[in-house]
A protein has these predicted regions:
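Amphipathic interaction/junction segments at domain boundaries or subunit interfaces
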Residues: 53, 64-153, 157
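Generic detection of intrinsically disordered/low-complexity segments and helix-coil linkers/edges
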Residues: 4, 22-23, 130, 163, ...
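N-terminal, charged low-complexity regulatory/assembly segments
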Residues: 1-65
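Unusually extended, aromatic-enriched hydrophobic runs near protein termini
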Residues: 47, 97-123, 171-196
Length: 198
């Protein structure tokens, strides 16, 4: 499997902080990730996109780091990996939105991406409340990030992925408003997403 940002960041942590154990930690990470992938091999292609890119490498890194540090520290380190990618994403999107008028298209892009990448085939259950006229408002009732983290006994890890949305989309443009007051990963019964033109 090709390297993900999570596996790269994990290997960097292992090499820098635990050089004498890095080989063993990498082997454990690889074996755990391989097992997680095998256990989820029957998932749909759409769900595999999320599992392979973020969820399963995140779980493998989190579990592996707990072999050499307390659980809370391992959680903060994996959160840092996800946060770093989100900050990069935010910077790239904000730069793109310097193109005059482009910000107006963002809610409609969110509608399309929700339907194609974050739909039922991928394990999500989006309820569209308001789409069009510069507004994307969706309640996500089910999420494979939350479900998979919970299934593997680490529901607290899901908050890293929830936080990445807020980091990526808050303050992208003066005329765009990102709102979310609830997430499944933070213990609520839904994620109430909203991106709208001011």
């Amino acid at each position: 499997m090709k390297e993900t940002y999570l596996s790269r960041d994990f290997r960097e942590t292992a090499a820098q902080r635990f050089p004498s154990q890095a080989k063993e930690l990498n082997a454990f990470f690889d074996a755990r990730l391989h097992a997680l992938l095998a256990e989820n091999a029957e998932a749909s292609k759409e769900k595999q996109y999320h599992l392979k890119r973020q969820i399963l490498p995140g779980i493998a890194a989190y579990e592996t780091l707990q072999r050499v540090m307390p659980k809370e520290e391992a959680l903060q380190i994996v959160h840092g990996y996800v946060e770093r990618l989100a900050r990069t994403s935010h910077k790239q999107l904000a730069t793109l939105l310097l193109i005059p008028g482009l910000y107006r298209l963002v809610p409609s892009v969110f509608v399309k991406s929700t339907r194609s990448v974050f739909g039922p085939a991928a394990g999500f259950d989006p309820k569209e409340l308001q789409v069009g006229n510069g507004i994307w408002r969706v309640d996500m009732m089910k999420c494979p990030y939350h479900d998979t983290c919970t299934e593997y006994g680490c529901p607290e890890l899901c908050r890293s992925f929830c936080d990445s949305d807020d980091i990526s989309y808050t303050g992208l443009h003066p005329k765009l408003i990102w709102e979310r007051s609830m997430t499944l990963g933070r213990g609520n019964d839904r994620c109430d997403f909203c991106m709208k033109v001011r």
